[in-house]
Amino acid sequence: MSKPLISSGKWHGKKVYFGLHYDLHAGEKDTDLGARCSPRELKPLLRMMAPDFVQTDCKGHPGMTSWYSKTPGATVSPGVVRDAMRQWRVATRELGLPLHCHYSGIWDMAAGAKHPDWAIRGPNGRPVGAPNETSGELIDQRMCPRGPYLEKLMLPQMIELIDRYQVDGFWVDGDLWATEPCYCDRCRTAWTSATGITEPPADEKNPNWVRWWNFTRESFEAYVTRYCDAIHAHKPGVLVCSNWLQTFRHPGEPKIPTDWISGDNAWVWGLDGSRCEARFLSTRGKHWDIMLWTFYCSHGMGQADSPWVAKPAEMLMQEAAVLLAFGGNVQVYENPPGLRDGRLVPWRQKRWGEVGRFIKKRRAICQGSRTIPQVAVLHSEHHLRATPTGRNLMWGMDITPVQGAVFSLLEAHYGVDILDEWALLPRLKEFPVVVAPEQDKMSDVMVRALQDYVRGGGRLLVSGPAAFDRFGGEFLGVKGGTLEVKATYHVPTGDGATPLYSEHWRLVTPTTAKGVGHLGKTPLLDDRLLVHPAFSVNRVGRGRVAYVPANLFRDFNRNRYPLTQGFVADVMQKLAGRLDIQVQAPIGTDVALRAQGRRRIIHLVNRCSGIPNQTANGAIDEIPEVGPVTVRMRMPQAPKRVALALEKGDLSWKHAAGVLTIKLARYRIHEAIVIE
């Protein structure tokens, strides 16, 4: 069983668990900012919701404050009629709540308008516009991380907020996900100094692009480090977080000195994102949370015919449960449509309070838990940094194979953790099974460690045609053959076969490995079959390695075919057999295997919805009960107690022949089975 990670960050304490994030992104068209957020108005509505901490509006992407900033060069929205920051500070202090500021970092439109020389420049020397903006008249609005913006405006304004309002922390938005390579003179000079290359590459086809992209990443990380160090030096105890930094899309050693890790989840269809974030963030060694949007729309942000609507409470509970099971905190984002004067909406605050009670009920059973290692999915930082798919530091990352591996394994009810090389290398022997999903560019150190892991008794699943070159035919027990391009073959599973597409497919022949199944040109199981196996399993030392020579997990993430998930389960069964903990449950149940002290806890999260399958409807409402669930756990001695921690369900258990068998008839949203 794994040891608890030592935290390298800071937080306000265990009881600060559920938060409210409120922001407006104040702009030039506002007219009544701060008019309706007096302490008298705020306090009853905050009590109704009962958050443990609050993040309030400060400076959004337009670069305008919703308070009277006195920092030279600051841009105060012309719509400020009363100082909202002062009112929120008084209200939260009287309620005993920490107050953080929502502060947009790299993305600052007002600073770009005043100081074009501070902004990111494209390869042509022109403005780059907003994130993902490629057409129309592009303006300066994103700051260069090497430019004077940080020292001239951002840090002075943060220090002003600390000194004038005694704020307790900063949640810096518009940072990682707003950054892309900059071609200003500062960056060009630094690039040439670091590399000796005169001209930075203009596009992704240039052989130096990966190096240039990583130069940008390192420049950004240095910028965040500078503001963290400056704030901590000015007033120790003020907490700092950069939105999405050190999360699933930014793997590697979390050495940047932020105090906690956070990111705001997608407003709709965000459940899958949280499934990965929770399993990765719990390996970072820092306090972490995910911010859930309390509202959504069905057809994209900003479309008039798809206005924002409040999420059902149960939708937020379901999204939260995925995070809570892995020991994370949760905050919710509120921005009532049409209200710019600072008002909170009573019926909405009541709803978020209901969600908060659901969350706080789970603190005792979730907080401070650690994983029971079962399946580790490798999310190599070396692979990601060698394969950027775009200019953006967050969105230009190829995470698809890792997502596909996690989702397919969860549907087979394995306990899954996501670890980068930094986290996995020192803990490799803890995990009975490791899956390396098309991580073609993992480090040589990782390859050798995985080979040694197998020789020592571990079980490894690798996928992708390039894995043959990385691990070698002798280790995999196969001989490499033709490399097919844009190929679809059918692989047998269950009572049939599933089509699997791969950009490249290596047709291998077993040598020492045992081939399983045959590739088919059609769904037929007894005709038009190739001699090449669907997958292979090789014994190496005391362990085993399974090899699927195609982009299996990329395909699953794109198509989510149940038969393909069944094929993944077949491969895992041949490779790993029966593990110490096995769960049988409906496919919509996610499992989290955790421990607290000597207690073992099996978390069950219901991802199902009672709403019909409609592509235009992202809501989760009327969540149906699901079951039955059966858990089998190898235990030499009978437990003293087996009980449900959260919901009142029909539970029974027995212990015989060294196996504990637990049966739960049904559960609703989130249940935790506690074994003592």
Walk through the language-model features, giving the residues of each:
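Aromatic- and glycine-enriched glycan-recognition loops and surfaces
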Residues: D30-M49, K70-L95, K152, A222, ...
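Carbohydrate-binding surfaces of carbohydrate-active enzymes
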Residues: S2-K15, L45, L99-H100, R164, ...
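Active-site-adjacent "subsite" loops/lids of carbohydrate-active enzymes
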Residues: C101, G105-Y165, P200-W213, T225
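Aromatic-lined carbohydrate-binding/catalytic grooves of carbohydrate-active enzymes
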Residues: R47-D83, W107-R126, T179-C187, R249-W260, ...
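N-terminal structural segment of carbohydrate-active enzymes
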Residues: S2-M64, L95-L97
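Short, solvent-exposed turn/loop segments enriched in Gly/Ser/Thr/Pro and often Arg
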Residues: D23-H25, Q55-M64, Y103-A110, W171-C182, ...
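Glycine-rich, aromatic-flanked loop segments that form ligand/cofactor-binding clefts
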Residues: Y17-G19, A50-C58, D83-T134, W171, ...
